[in-house]
Amino acid sequence: PARAALADAVAATAWTLKRPEARGIDPERVFVGGMSAGAWLAAMTGMDRSYLAAYGIDSRKLAGLLLVSGQMTTHFQLKIDLHYPQSQFEPVIDRYAPLGHLSPELPPILLVTGESGLDMPGGPEENALMAAGLAALGHPLVRCFHIAGADHGGAFDRCEPFLTDFIAEASEARR
């Protein structure tokens, strides 16, 4: 199911970006995002360039990735589906991990999580590692926020100001 969900996310993004004039959208202003498993799907869609390239789309053209409480290692559901020997929260960084696709050429990236110990186990730390890795590689626009007192769902409930500010910042940076 996780690989099928990823294929669906990529196909939906490609559909949105194909013939943008017919859909009334500016392809330069498309952000891809999600929460929890949706953040993993969005990250993989935008970070592993091969997925959108299969549709003739350069993922670097996305306006940004908006990732809320996402798993930046290989998603635990995919590990179950593919019979990985690792436990649910044991980190795996392979071709199915956003952390395995770090590059300074990625679109702008926002990472928002709940507080460590309240959000998913290891989630805030995985997101911090991704932000640090991208910054070390010279990525021009990555932001990472951990919302104090927020659990996994609470991060979503309280992420709107971070999303709004980041979209404005990323849009301004593209000009």
Identify the meaning behind each predicted range.
Residues 27, 60, 104, 136-139:
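Short, well-ordered coil/turn elements that cap or connect secondary structure elements
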Residues 11-80, 93-94:
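Primarily recognizes the serine-hydrolase "nucleophile elbow" in alpha/beta-hydrolase
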Residues 1, 53, 118-121, 153-154:
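A generic structural signal for short coil/turn motifs at secondary-structure boundaries
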Residues 30, 109, 142:
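Short, conserved active-site loop motifs that form the nucleotide-linked donor/cofactor pocket
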Residues 56-78, 89-128, 132:
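The feature captures the conserved acid-bearing segment of alpha/beta-hydrolase catalytic domains
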Residues 112, 124, 128-131, 135-175:
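C-terminal catalytic histidine-bearing segment of alpha/beta-hydrolase fold enzymes
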Residues 25, 117-119, 148-150:
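Active-site rim elements
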Residues 1-7:
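Cap/lid segment of the alpha/beta-hydrolase catalytic domain
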